[in-house]
């Protein structure tokens, strides 16, 4: 077999001691990520406040603001996104690290989606019972506003004083949309009116803006009692004088609209609605599948899951009636009392399931979040319409991950409770989102989800977590619990059918309810088209990739390694997830091919090289490079390569170990200029070398020759 020989020079990466003024380094894509994200946060002050992105006086300004969400403010954000896309395109992907390249692709996808989505903004009414301003403003302050110090409490009161102005912004936008006949169906408007009336039905002192504020100040224990009462009284006064009148103005706008509206539910009812729905499906599933294709996938999965459920119901002796009738009877038999004692009992069970899940997860995960997770019920005014949800922990540790559950009657059952907790907490959303926040390898915009999340992967992972718990024996001999897990999966499969039915096939609200989806869920799909499809489409992709990994690796497959691969990808579109898993499979195949007893140590090189060294040997088991970077390697035809290190490289490896130990002196006899600054090694496990290729200098006097022969390991780019 032909032998290929090429020459590169290698320098150990240590501090610069150059003579004279060093050249100014070129701006990197990582610099762009940092600067653009800061600009993005300044354009989105509510996000800056919730994540505590800045510090000092600048952060204080954001924490005192309640930013507007108007057509004008959104236009400024779109202009910033377009500017970001233009600048991002100036960076050469071939000069990026793997993480940088994926981050650039993710940012490009997110900014393009935001820009495209703004033209469909008129299809989103600003007042509705699930994600309207009337819901988001209370959630922003009562849950997400940082509240640790007395200054935080003062900022809360300052922002509360701006709530009425933000509600008036929403009313003005809603009035403009109504003039174009762009408003929700009658049943959505009526439900929103009921919810808004309920929000202002209590005395101001009992309103969530006041009670949650008082409770959080008390929990923080940093605000003196007298000052705490003073601030609470200020909040109560603002709610009475400003917030309640603003809510009444919103209700006054909606009431006549409810008289004008009909019950047509889907986007098809609007001009351009079909295009808007196609965009929604692309946004939420990150695929190009049509509504019809997704509808058919849903029908197939519904039939499969119903057959499996029927078998378990028969084992439980429930043979009479339709599947839905038998499930309802079982669900009712496991209901909690609709009393305060019942509410306490369900929350106690949630806590037990959550902590038990944390213990069991150690068998499937070797990487778990540091941030804690807590569970709490929704405030009463949200119970009728809210879906169970997870809120990420604060990056500074001031707020844990939070699971909120609505304690309305249909949720007060043990039947699906275990599955719900697994989805929202451990090993579901809390594992994925908190681990992403804690991953130092990711740029900050990804750790904080500054540009938003990716529903297909987030919700797909949550649904996968439900299934994983069932597959792993977490339900033990609990047949009712296993049935509940299948019922929740059936629910997500029906969502594919119902969401596409409503928005592409002219289904009515009642048709969707008759198909097996409760009314409040149907209404959520009406106001948030496409999102319900993200769950199962994401889960199916994860399961497909897991099956691929099992077939590729055989008895070398490790569920922990697979989960590491998926979770380390961060929140990305499904095609990028697949590329990450493919890279893991190539690497795992390399490891599996090693002789017994030999292991590998990963080494991450700057700017864009990654290698796997066999521990205790001089083999480079894997070298990864960006496409087209001929300065690092020559094109070759052999699919498998073996690289033999020269003696000089072995000395460099020793030097790398010394540098990582904090010494950094070159080995005896080494000559030449000091290497360039700026490189760094992200080195898990044992100390290993940090080296980089350069075309201008060598740490050693002699050049280093790599002799490549046909033998062992391929050279490839891990994400392409």
Predicted regions and their residues:
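N-terminal maturation segment of proteins
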Residues: 19-593
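Bacterial N-terminal signal peptides
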Residues: 5-15
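Short beta-strand segments in beta-sandwich/barrel cores
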Residues: 620, 630-632, 648-652, 697
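Glycine- and acidic-residue-biased ligand/ion/polar-headgroup-sensing regions
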Residues: 636-659, 664, 678-685
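Histidine-centered metal-chelating micro-motifs
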Residues: 629-631, 682-709
């Amino acid at each position: 077999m032909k032998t290929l020989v090429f020459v590169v020079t290698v320098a150990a990466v240590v501090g610069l001691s150059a003579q004279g003024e060093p050249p100014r380094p070129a701006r990197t894509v990582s610099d762009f990520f940092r600067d653009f994200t800061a600009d993005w946060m300044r354009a989105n002050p509510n996000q800056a406040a919730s994540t505590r992105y800045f510090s000092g006086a600048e952060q204080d300004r954001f924490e005192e603001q309640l930013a507007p969400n108007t057509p004008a403010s959104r236009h400024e954000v779109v202009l910033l996104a377009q500017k970001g896309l233009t600048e991002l395109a100036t960076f050469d992907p071939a000069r990026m690290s793997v993480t940088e390249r994926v981050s650039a692709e993710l940012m490009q996808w997110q900014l393009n989606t935001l820009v495209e989505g703004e033209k469909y903004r008129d299809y989103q009414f600003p007042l509705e019972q699930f994600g309207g301003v009337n819901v988001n403003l209370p959630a922003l302050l009562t849950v997400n506003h940082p509240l640790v110090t007395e200054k935080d409490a003062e900022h809360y009161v300052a922002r509360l004083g701006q709530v009425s102005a933000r509600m008036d912004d929403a009313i003005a936008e809603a009035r403009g949309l109504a003039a174009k006949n762009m408003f929700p169906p009658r049943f959505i408007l009526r439900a929103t009116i009921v919810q808004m009336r309920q929000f202002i039905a209590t005395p101001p002192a009992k309103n969530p803006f006041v009670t949650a504020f008082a409770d959080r100040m008390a929990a923080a224990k940093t605000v003196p009692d007298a000052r705490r009462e003073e601030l609470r009284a200020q909040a109560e006064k603002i709610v009475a004088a400003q917030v309640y009148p603003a809510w009444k103005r919103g209700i006054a706008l909606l009431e006549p609209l409810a008289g004008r509206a009909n019950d047509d539910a889907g986007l098809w009812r609007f001009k351009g609605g079909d295009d808007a729905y196609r965009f929604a499906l692309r946004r939420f599933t990150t695929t190009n599948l049509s509504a019809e294709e997704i509808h058919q996938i849903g029908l197939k999965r519904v039939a499969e899951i119903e057959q499996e459920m029927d078998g378990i119901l028969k084992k439980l002796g429930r043979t009479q009636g339709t599947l839905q009738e038998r499930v309802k009877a079982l669900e009712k038999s496991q209901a909690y009392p609709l009393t305060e004692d019942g509410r306490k009992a369900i929350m106690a069970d949630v806590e037990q399931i959550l902590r038990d899940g944390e213990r069991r997860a150690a068998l499937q995960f070797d990487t778990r979040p540091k941030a804690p997770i807590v569970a709490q019920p929704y405030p009463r005014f949200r119970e009728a319409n809210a879906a169970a949800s997870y809120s990420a922990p604060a990056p500074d540790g001031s707020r844990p991950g939070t699971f909120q559950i609505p304690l309305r009657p249909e949720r007060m059952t043990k039947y699906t409770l275990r599955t719900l907790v697994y989805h929202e907490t451990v090993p579901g959303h809390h594992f994925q989102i908190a681990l992403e926040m804690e991953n130092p390898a990711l740029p900050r915009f990804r750790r904080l989800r500054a540009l938003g999340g990716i529903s297909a992967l987030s919700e797909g992972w949550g649904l996968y977590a439900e299934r994983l718990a069932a597959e792993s024996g977490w339900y033990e001999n609990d047949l009712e619990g296993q049935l509940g897990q299948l019922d929740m999966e059936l629910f997500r499969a029906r969502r594919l059918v119902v969401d596409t039915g409503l928005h592409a096939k002219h289904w009515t609200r009642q048709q969707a309810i008759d198909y097996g989806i409760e009314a409040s869920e149907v209404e959520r799909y009406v106001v948030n088209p496409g999102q319900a499809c993200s769950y199962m489409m994401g889960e199916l992709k994860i399961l497909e990739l897991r099956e691929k990994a099992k077939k590729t690796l055989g008895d070398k497959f490790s569920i922990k390694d697979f989960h590491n691969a998926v979770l380390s990808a961060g929140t990305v579109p499904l095609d990028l997830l697949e590329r990450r898993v493919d890279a893991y499979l190539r690497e795992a195949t390399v490891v599996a091919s090693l002789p017994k007893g030999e292991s590998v140590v990963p080494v991450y090189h700057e700017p864009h090289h990654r290698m796997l060294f066999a521990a205790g040997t001089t083999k480079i088991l894997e070298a990864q490079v960006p496409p087209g970077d001929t300065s690092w390697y020559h094109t070759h035809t052999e699919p498998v390569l073996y690289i033999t290190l020269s003696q000089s490289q072995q000395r460099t490896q020793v030097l790398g170990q010394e540098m990582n130990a904090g010494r950094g002196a070159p080995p005896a006899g080494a000559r030449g200029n000091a290497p360039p600054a700026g490189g760094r090694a992200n080195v898990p496990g044992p100390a290993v070398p940090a080296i980089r290729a350069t075309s201008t200098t060598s740490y050693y006097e002699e050049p280093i020759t790599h002799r490549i022969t046909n033998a062992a390991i391929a050279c490839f780019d891990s994400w392409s």
